[in-house]
């Protein structure tokens, strides 16, 4: 008979932990938060020292009833929610609902869901840390005060359904500021000169560097001509050889932010998908005979620290697999996070290799686990040693430079290289063995015109990185923030980069005009610092909120009285309604744009926006092939005559038949390339870069 009750957030976590604890423990799930501020009202009493009015979340009544039923039967109750501020707040809300004593040591935390870690945590229960709870409460109340005051103003003055929040408004600002930089950018001309040189049977390239021992800018064609006219023949001399040994160290194990960035670059995962998969790996995977095991440590962390035991196990694995020379000699275990003394995201055991785990994981789970495992193991490997050489190739005071690099010892690069490095610094560039005074022959001198480029738009990975660098938000907020600005139609993704929409820019301009603090980066960073101080017990949460709200409410009053009403006109669709004959307009819905009758609400006719690709349906030969989106936002191709014709393809038909079997050909993406292949047989054409 179980006389100990353990409460966790999710059924998956409950199932894993119950197997470890045995028959004397009953483990049940709260299904996340059980209490929150009400949706129908502010829920914060600004006249009573910002007292929050928590209620049971709608739909959670049966869960709470079940929790209370089990709590009555239990001799002892343990609250085992996640080891962060959010988890601490969930534990506190549970203790209030179950009427547990505040002084009770009933809180258990573990950074990984393995048998040893879970059992050990139950030997050291503690009380609920109210400083962590207060930091989470303060964040929640601040966000509620901002959202519930600004949003109604935007509904009244701009459009219903809009919102503005502390972190999402700054994220939107970053996207818009970058777009304005691009709009205002004026390209500037510049030139380069590249020379191809021969030494014996070897060829190498070098770039123009100096004229008369000084940097010389090539701003236009005249500058280039001045250099090329000063050259006399094709003989050059090696005037300097600089050989160095360069050490490259591996990256630290993942934090939440770096995991989201690397998964976006290497696996093409969105931040939300990365966190969903990481949660599954953390909460437990059924390994059949080995039972259910959490494969990675807690995935919401800003720490790169690792435990001594994890470090030792990884080094033992490296020694056995690669040899002693591949084991790192560095003593540092990484930085401790700003929020808590968590560990980095790592495998719970290095010995559970990606190959061994493949049979138990879905394809995407395995890809993410492999990324986490390789990054962690590589972080404990020896640095790579590179031999670099710089050659100065000179004639008539005109200097070209060639840079070469070869890998002397691969070290960690045997296993893993960061995505951002793949394109640039890791390629070997061998130069011939040359010494000062050697003569080389120029076979080509090629000037090239260039123009400066504007800064690139944000990818999801770069936006996450920038939010982290600016210290805006927390590990748990990056993915929801990016989700929110997309769902509100404030930004859109084009070629995997964020572009602000007209609506996003209108909302931003209003918030900037009337609520300047909300979109101010420095203000948002300072607020995060104050939340950290609350968590550390150095600040009172009510004072922090009071100081903010006293000035904020004046901004709200000014906006209500001074903000002018903005009319956002619907974009004409270019066709008439087939029901009533009124013009159709383009609207934005939950799943993207659609056509609706301008005579709404008298006429409620709507139509999907169909994008044809200029190819006749290969199945019925009557309809057109159109681009559609699945519920998961994945593009697929179907027939415009659906449901009469049920043609469907994930790959884009090209409008030609296979010369071998006469089935239709499709354009299949392969990384950054694409290839025309047959949908039925093995026919394929050359890869298109």
Swiss-Prot record:
The record marks 33, 139-140, 143, 148, 155, 300, 488 as: Interaction with DNA. GO terms for biological process: DNA topological change. InterPro entries: Topo_IA (IPR000380), Topo_IA_2 (IPR003601), Topo_IA_AS (IPR023406), Topo_IA_cen (IPR013497), Topo_IA_cen_sub1 (IPR013824), Topo_IA_cen_sub2 (IPR013825), Topo_IA_cen_sub3 (IPR013826), Topo_IA_core_domain (IPR023405). Residues 129-557 form the Topo IA-type catalytic domain. Its cofactor is Mg(2+). One of its GO terms (cellular component) is chromosome. Mg(2+) binds at residues 9, 82. It comes from the Bacteria. Keywords: DNA-binding, Isomerase, Magnesium, Metal-binding, Repeat, Topoisomerase, Zinc, Zinc-finger. The active site is at residue 298. The keyword Zinc applies. The keyword Metal-binding applies. A zinc finger (C4-type) spans 577-603, 617-645, 658-681. Residues 163-168 are annotated as: Interaction with DNA. It holds the Pfam family Toprim. GO terms for molecular function: DNA binding; DNA topoisomerase type I (single strand cut, ATP-independent) activity; zinc ion binding. Its EC number is 5.6.2.1. NCBIfam families: topA_bact. PANTHER family: DNA TOPOISOMERASE (PTHR42785:SF1), DNA TOPOISOMERASE, TYPE IA, CORE (PTHR42785). Belongs to the type IA topoisomerase family. Releases the supercoiling and torsional tension of DNA, which is introduced during the DNA replication and transcription, by transiently cleaving and rejoining one strand of the DNA duplex. Introduces a single-strand break via transesterification at a target site in duplex DNA. The scissile phosphodiester is attacked by the catalytic tyrosine of the enzyme, resulting in the formation of a DNA-(5'-phosphotyrosyl)-enzyme intermediate and the expulsion of a 3'-OH DNA strand. The free DNA strand then undergoes passage around the unbroken strand, thus removing DNA supercoils. Monomer. This is DNA topoisomerase 1. It comes from Staphylococcus epidermidis (strain ATCC 35984 / DSM 28319 / BCRC 17069 / CCUG 31568 / BM 3577 / RP62A). The lineage of its organism: Bacteria, Bacillati, Bacillota, Bacilli, Bacillales.
